[in-house]
Amino acid sequence: MGPYLSQPKREKVTTSGEGKSVIFAASEMQGWRNTMEDAHIHRPDIVQDVSVFGVFDGHGGREVAQFVEKHFIDELLKNKNFKEQKFEDALKETFLKMDELLMTPEGAKELNNYKATDTDESYAGCTANVALIHKNTLYVANAGDSRSVLCRNNTNFDMSVDHKPDNNEEKSRIERAGGFVSDGRVNGNLNLSRALGDLEYKSDSKLRPNEQLIIAFPDVKKTELTPQDKFILMGCDGVFETLNHQELLKHVNTTLGNSPVTENLLSKAAEDLLDQLLAPDTSQGTGCDNMTTILVYLKK
């Protein structure tokens, strides 16, 4: 059986909500893929003046994405730097904490419970792109190729950069760790250089966590929000295959129009976007992935 269904699953699971400073809508669609391996989190007002949103794109199975979806917020809230409002450090430490938990016997057991197939070993991992809004400051932590794009002055202000093995800095680390990059893949296998999970690539006891073939350590980008910032578009890589960032923002803005933004309108914008991106068939290979997007509207 190949990676694709004979007909796409167009049904969407959409969730929306509102906080003090944001309105959000999150929508996911399995699409042409045989299984759904995306996951996401959405927590407006997790504590006073802080909202957190995240997308996790699984590979090699759904289990790591589901594990991170379950544990990320709890671990972030427990983090000492989070409590001290040192959010950049808190995000970095929480990404690394996910791998620490996955390496425990309890974590391995929980992963097994999430798995679609009954095997003892897991070779799964996931990307992670997490946006944290504190008052007028936006932080985006990223490991992998999921993305966050800020709509600023009706143009795209990119809040993350993909981590690909053929990037010079990433490739150098991989080679220092004893690996190689072939056809844009680590050791000819994984087309990401940073991810949560993928523990078989993180097993060299002589190397620190940020020196392994694959690392969970995120880049964190920070920006001060302005009145010209309208919304954040977050998505797994399937959302970004067919349209560029400016085209994606234009599509959302067209749906929003000049109407007051509500949960229902934002949900429609998210769902319409996924419909627009879904390929009519699998011949080209793009528009065929699982798709998850979160739209976070910034109240004025």
Swiss-Prot record:
EC number: 3.1.3.16
MF-aspect GO terms: metal ion binding; protein serine/threonine phosphatase activity
Superkingdom classification of source: Eukaryota
PPM-type phosphatase domain span: 23-298
Binding site for Mn(2+) 1: D57, G58
Binding-site residues for Mn(2+) 2, renumbered to this chain: D57, D237, D289
Locations listed in the record: Membrane
Cofactor: Mg(2+); Mn(2+)
Function: Enzyme with a broad specificity.
Descriptive protein name: Probable protein phosphatase 2C 3
Organism the protein comes from: Paramecium tetraurelia
